Curated annotation (Swiss-Prot):
<dbReference type="GO" id="GO:0016020">
    <property type="term" value="C:membrane"/>
</dbReference>
<keyword id="KW-0809">Transit peptide</keyword>
<dbReference type="InterPro" id="IPR048400">
    <property type="entry name" value="SLS1_N"/>
</dbReference>
<dbReference type="GO" id="GO:0009060">
    <property type="term" value="P:aerobic respiration"/>
</dbReference>
<dbReference type="GO" id="GO:0005743">
    <property type="term" value="C:mitochondrial inner membrane"/>
</dbReference>
<dbReference type="Pfam" id="PF20776">
    <property type="entry name" value="SLS1_N"/>
</dbReference>
<comment type="similarity">
    <text>Belongs to the SLS1 family.</text>
</comment>
<dbReference type="InterPro" id="IPR048401">
    <property type="entry name" value="SLS1_C"/>
</dbReference>
<keyword id="KW-0999">Mitochondrion inner membrane</keyword>
<keyword id="KW-0648">Protein biosynthesis</keyword>
<dbReference type="GO" id="GO:0032543">
    <property type="term" value="P:mitochondrial translation"/>
</dbReference>
<keyword id="KW-0496">Mitochondrion</keyword>
<dbReference type="GO" id="GO:0042645">
    <property type="term" value="C:mitochondrial nucleoid"/>
</dbReference>
<keyword id="KW-0472">Membrane</keyword>
<protein>
    <recommendedName>
        <fullName>Sigma-like sequence protein 1, mitochondrial</fullName>
    </recommendedName>
</protein>
<dbReference type="GO" id="GO:0005739">
    <property type="term" value="C:mitochondrion"/>
</dbReference>
<comment type="function">
    <text>Involved in aerobic respiration where it is required for assembly of respiratory chain enzyme complexes III and IV. Also has a role in mitochondrial gene expression. May be part of a mitochondrial membrane-associated RNA-shuttling system, delivering NAM1-associated transcripts to the translation machinery.</text>
</comment>
Length: 643
């Protein structure tokens, strides 16, 4: 028993005592008429610290079982005990069933049985099985390995011995099974499907596979019972192979591209020269559909796209190609398999000043170069007409101009770390309040407060027509994503890429290259009108079907319609195939200028995630000219180069 705290009792009595108005305790709660004592434990009364552990009262298990009248409440724990007690019996019975019917085993069957016992059971189960047959032998089995225990079971308990397997005149053992094919299709699908998981599972059973690529021959070695199982299983797998012929309308893809598609989609391609077609084979129709998308994505080239390269560097500057190391994180599936390099300046070893003027000097453009850029960006441009919803977009993207060993070149968007510090102090761009002076808020605070916008971009490639006609423009469909990662279907914007001209500026003396892009796009739909929603898709039945039949879940691209029919402005119906899906998280920042017109440029920071065909993500920084007609191209380029 703990001692009564007299000081605490006197203080309680004073607080609850009856006092007059002149008392210093006036207004306190009075002591109740029927005084009752509340017994506190040592912790509640403050006599024991909170960190001191007190013994807890735990009721007896026997008492708790007596108080519960329903025995079914503890039925689950009894089931667990029952299962635990019988797990060893199940293992012993499983080992007992593996006993061969014959005492003489071929060497392959003996090795397969030995491997099965070693890999399927632990040492305790094997020792207990031996103890059930030889109780006196358990003492010297404690430190034996599983392989030795398994061998002891086969030879000492089951009295089985390995014998040499007779061979045929051809040299092939009698415990083997040979499959002969006309093409390497069946063997190739076994090797590539699920990265060879099918053959790996067979190998775990004790089967050995010998493949002859020149003869299209597959030989399986093992015990007779396992060979029978392998024969039935392999024939069942090969019976699921489906085929589809795909006609090629454009240039034939290279052999490397075909091999890459086969690897990515687990399919097999056979070229039929008489029909000018590819015969695609796979173990499922979904893999064939995916292979067709990869093939279309690889061979389809946009005829409405032009690209020119210009190197801006001093003739005295020495440049070399340096390897690009971020291929896995940034490049897509088609370019990821190649080695890329960027043109960079070379600093002499005897140079003591690392911050040389040549490296950090802003590239200077001449009027002749700017005139050449304008000529390249204005090729094949359509006539701008507000009635046709055709608009122009002029932007400059930061990145690297890369070259491969085959002299092909690409531009990969990339943000160098030297630009991050400049972005952190830029204010956010707000179109509604462009005239007001914004309060600068750092970039990281924008991202934390969820000030960015999210979009999903669906890229569609026109399916080649059966008759020779003019090529249709590529299609992009954009959707907004709300704060709950739900796609807002009423924000759909289908855009036709009428023309895309770009000029890539290679600047070896700088940390990044620049891509100047002039886009001409046409919007196929007006803005959604809530007062008249039926008129929104009245002229685009294909888009209406696309919205109704697609199940919109972010990162669940298999639920989208892969093909849609679009009514083009020239009253033609064109079928499009979905080839890629990109997710954008966009943040618009204001470009710092010293002029009164402070809203002529927008800096767009994008975090882009690939999906559908590609994996990975990359970050992109674009400088967008809001009014290309009001700002000259030379001024725009010089402003971006001096950023």
């Amino acid at each position: 028993m703990w001692k009564f705290n007299k000081k605490l009792a006197r203080l309680t009595y004073r607080l609850y005592s009856s006092s007059g108005p002149s008392s210093p305790l006036h207004g306190k709660k009075k002591l109740p008429q029927n005084l009752k004592f509340v017994v506190l434990n040592p912790t509640q009364s403050g006599l024991v610290k909170n960190d001191q552990k007190q013994p807890r009262h735990r009721p007896s298990k026997k008492r708790s079982h007596k108080e519960t009248g329903d025995n079914n409440l503890d039925f689950g724990s009894k089931l667990l005990v029952f299962e635990k007690q019988n797990s060893l019996d199940s293992a012993l019975n499983s080992i007992r069933l593996k006993k061969p019917t014959s005492a003489s085993l071929p060497s392959l069957e003996y090795n397969a049985l030995l491997q099965s016992l070693t890999s399927s059971y632990n040492r305790y189960q094997l020792r207990e099985f031996i103890s059930t047959h030889q109780p006196d032998s358990s003492s010297h089995l404690t430190h034996w390995k599983k392989s030795k225990l398994s061998q002891y079971i086969i030879e000492k308990i089951w009295n089985c011995q390995p014998i040499s397997t007779p061979t045929t005149p051809t040299g092939i053992k009698s415990t083997s099974l040979t499959f002969q094919f006309d093409s390497p299709r069946e063997i190739f699908l076994l090797l590539i499907t699920q990265n060879g998981k099918i053959l790996t599972n067979f190998n775990k059973l004790g089967l050995t596979f010998i493949i002859s690529i020149q003869d299209n021959e597959l030989t399986v070695k093992g015990s007779p019972s396992l060979l029978k199982y392998a024969e039935i299983s392999l024939n069942k797998i090969w019976s699921n192979i489906t085929h589809e012929n795909v006609r090629m309308y454009s240039l034939m893809p290279s052999k490397d591209v075909i091999n890459l598609i086969q690897k990515e989609t687990h399919t097999f391609f056979e070229y039929l020269p008489d029909l000018q077609m590819y015969k695609i084979s796979a173990l499922s129709t979904k893999k064939i559909s995916m292979a067709k998308v990869f093939l279309l994505n690889a061979v389809a080239s946009n005829p409405n796209t032009t690209q020119h390269h210009h190197t801006i560097a001093s003739p005295a500057l020495k440049t070399e190609l340096y390897p690009f190391n971020n291929t896995l994180e940034n490049l897509d599936w088609l370019n990821k398999s190649q080695d890329w390099a960027r043109l960079q300046s070379v600093v002499p070893k005897n140079c003591t000043d690392l911050m040389t003027p040549t490296e950090n000097a802003t590239p200077e453009l001449t009027d002749a170069q700017v005139s050449q850029f304008e000529s390249s960006l204005s090729k094949n441009i359509p006539s701008l007409s507000p009635s046709d919803s055709i608009s122009q977009s002029l932007s400059i993207t930061l990145g690297h101009s890369l070259q491969s060993a085959s002299f092909s070149s690409i531009f990969q968007p990339l943000i160098h770390k030297s630009f991050i510090s400049k972005l952190l102090n830029l204010p956010m761009y707000k179109e509604s309040s462009s005239s007001a002076v914004p309060v600068p808020v750092p970039l990281d605070q924008h991202l934390i407060t969820n000030a960015h916008q999210s979009f999903i971009q669906l890229n569609f490639t026109p399916v080649p027509p059966t008759s020779g006609s003019s090529s249709s423009p590529f299609l992009q469909i954009w959707f907004e994503i709300d704060e709950f990662d739900n796609i807002v279907t009423t924000s759909m914007r289908p855009l036709l890429k009428l023309q895309e001209n770009s000029v890539i500026l290679r600047t070896p003396q700088c940390q990044t290259d620049y891509k100047i892009t002039s886009d001409y796009i046409q919007d196929l739909l007006p803005d959604f009108d809530q007062t008249n929603p039926d008129a929104w898709l009245s002229e685009q039945k294909g888009l209406q079907e696309f919205l109704l039949k697609s199940h919109w879940k972010l990162n669940k691209y298999q639920n989208l319609m892969k093909k849609i029919n679009i009514s083009l402005p020239d009253n033609l119906i064109q079928q499009y195939q979905l080839t890629d899906v990109l997710t954008h998280r966009v943040l618009n920042l204001r470009f710092p200028t010293n002029t009164a017109q402070d809203d002529k440029y927008i800096i767009q920071y994008s975090d882009i995630s690939r999906g559908f065909l590609n994996n990975g993500s990359y970050r992109q920084l674009d400088f967008i000219n809001v009014n290309p007609s009001e700002t000259s191209l030379k001024t725009f380029i010089n402003d971006v180069l001096s950023f």
